[in-house]
């Protein structure tokens, strides 16, 4: 088991659902900022929100006899988000890379993907839905709650965290 680590907040939540029970996110660092978002092709002009997506998902299923496909590298976070917004008529397609290409290679209709600037989405004629922000992410320092219960480990972890904090304050990454 790990005592201390650095990971992207998105990867932490995707890989380890319920991890908050065992790990404390000590702080977010000032680098690696990105957002996990829902994006649709630009030519889907009638789809601006998740509610619009829900509406067309029923039409899509009736017309094509299959559910709307959502390509993603984040199936857990995507499912949790879409279901919380009431979207039910979709199927997750696990992306192995270049997720933004999936709608244009007929592997999915829409995507969820991580983006820092949105430039790659725009370059691939995709746009983020108005309410399509799933998760804000950045690199963060993680601490095992179990390790914090050990006096010696807690002392060492605090020293390390103070050094990291001082270094981050004096010089950007």
What are these regions (language model features)?
Residues 1-173:
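Domain-level signature for soluble enzymes in the chorismate/prephenate branch of the shikimate pathway
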């Amino acid at each position: 088991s790990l005592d201390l680590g650095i990971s992207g907040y998105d990867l932490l939540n995707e890989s380890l659902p319920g991890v908050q029970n065992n790990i404390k996110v000590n702080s977010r660092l000032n680098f690696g900022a990105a957002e996990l978002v829902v994006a649709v092709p630009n030519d889907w002009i009638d789809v601006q929100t998740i509610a619009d997506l829900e509406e067309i998902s029923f039409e899509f299923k009736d017309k094509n006899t299959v559910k709307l496909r959502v390509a993603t590298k984040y199936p857990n976070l995507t499912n949790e988000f879409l279901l919380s917004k009431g979207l039910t008529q979709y199927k997750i397609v696990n992306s192995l890379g270049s997720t933004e290409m999936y709608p244009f290679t007929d592997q999915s209709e829409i995507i969820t993907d991580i983006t820092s600037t949105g430039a790659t989405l725009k370059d691939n004629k995709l746009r983020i839905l108005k309410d399509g922000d799933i998760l804000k992410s950045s690199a963060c320092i993680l601490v095992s709650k179990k390790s914090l219960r050990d006096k010696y480990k807690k002392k060492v972890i605090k020293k390390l965290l103070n050094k990291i904090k001082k270094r981050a304050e004096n010089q950007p990454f």
